[in-house]
Amino acid sequence: MITKEEYIEYADSAYSIIPLTREIDNAGDTPISLYSKISDQQNTFLLESVEGGNRWAQFSIIGFDCQDYIKVSGNQIETCLDGVSKSFHSDDPLSSIQKITSQDTAPELEGMPRFYGGYVGFFAYESAQYAETKIAKLASKNSKFKDHMPEIYLIKAEKLIIFDNFASTTKIIFNANSKKFSYTESQKELDKIEKLIKHPITITNDNFKKPTGSLEFKSNFTKAEY
């Protein structure tokens, strides 16, 4: 755990992000139960690592309340960084993404999983065009997803819950912006996360109704469109 003196030292060393951690006693919780407690937050995710085929890795990583994002559609990039939204054209979206993400620097701390904050998301199949010029020159095909599915979408994870599957322990992390949060304010953010996941789950007993009549399924694509 970082002390106040270490926090100030890291901030003075030009680190823009300082990870603060706290191990909490959440006996009986699982990655799924922890995720259910934050699932109503904005932009959430649960990452499970796998090593060597079917063998589960050590950590389950839960992120939530992700505010910053990078969205790439064609050569148009939309960003929301520190509450400021922008949209601009880029001839090289991958370089633009690298330029944005490289602005954040954080110290390497012992006892942390390999991922404890940063950008997560997806690179769609079509994003290969940004790295391979031959693909970019191919004629574009119409797609039902084209209007609402970007080629790249990344969100910045600053608040995380790390569940250790080997030790059955829970660690919470707040990646503090050293220019916006003091040490005391960062500890208060950890307090909020701890309170959130220690809140008991409310289980509703829904009365399910048996469907009447036959169910008809319809594909979103015709065979010709596929």
Please give the residue ranges for each predicted region.
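Short, flexible active-site-proximal loops enriched in glycine and acidic residues
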Residues: 105-113, 200-206
